[in-house]
Amino acid sequence: MDSTDTRLLQALARNARASVSDLARSLDLARSTVQTRLEKLERDGTIAGYSLRLGEHAAAARIRATVLLQISPRAAPALLSRLRATPEVERAHSSSGRFDLILQLAAETTTALDETLDRIGAFDGVTRSESLIHLATKIDRAI
């Protein structure tokens, strides 16, 4: 990936709905160059898809939390399967240190978040959890 690919990805991060022609114009590249690079980035998995990113107002309507989980050594496969089936779980990361998994949750209400936390805490293999409620997003550079 070179600087042109990086610029292309940054342009898509700003507006994933931009047409190939608009991208080419804004990056001062030929339309065919942009099309070829997009196809390559999709083929090699750099671009995994195009998705909706909620605006601040819509995102603020959901309550988010980071949940740190300690789990039993052999519990990960079954636990991850249960977490995948839990719609409030947006992300799950394995980690080093005291906690084995870091989850990001989102719920419509504090009651729904509380119920989700209780459900996850009761899953087989969870030995300890710690929840951190997000109050405000100060920096968001996610692409």
Where are these regions (language model features)?
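A compositional/biophysical signature of low hydrophobicity enriched in polar/charged and small residues
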Residues: M1-I143
